[in-house]
Amino acid sequence: SMRRMVAYCSSLQTLNVSGWDTSNVTDMSEAFAGCRMLEELDVSSFDTARVENFFGTFSGLEFVTALDVGHFDTSAATNMDSMFDGNFSLTTLDVSGFNTAHVQNLNRMFTNCQNLTELDVSGFDTSNVTTMDNMFEGCNMLAELNLSGWNIEKVESMRYMFSGDNHLESIGVDPAAFGRGNTEGM
């Protein structure tokens, strides 16, 4: 487990994790959460094939502008709640290859990622997701999201999903998929 490994090291500015063996890690919850002064975090060598819990893994990294998570194997993941919550300075984030087939919780995944101008979540498999409250809340630089392929049949709550997203012009939603009553409070 890497649960809260270096969490809340609020004055830490640099951290070299390039040699870390993460191949047997199943829990990365809040591993780097609250390391708000951290300016760079290179997780490009992380093996995440066994990780089930990504709750708050990178939450509160206020000054990190890029996270190389494009190679992450998320096929075992069930929880991505608050994974990138509060990453105010993040300008690029490639999650287009994330396997979300087993994920149940997407709450606050990108909340307050206020400098992201693009985010490709079109390939997310949401067929097992039950909750996505506040998922994109405060991502006020995003102009569009493509959610047209999302299956939300099991979703019970989507409250404030797009709250504060003032520039969001298109969410590419299939009205038939999103018109089931579980969209209350969006």
Predicted ranges, named:
Residues 1-186:
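Negatively charged
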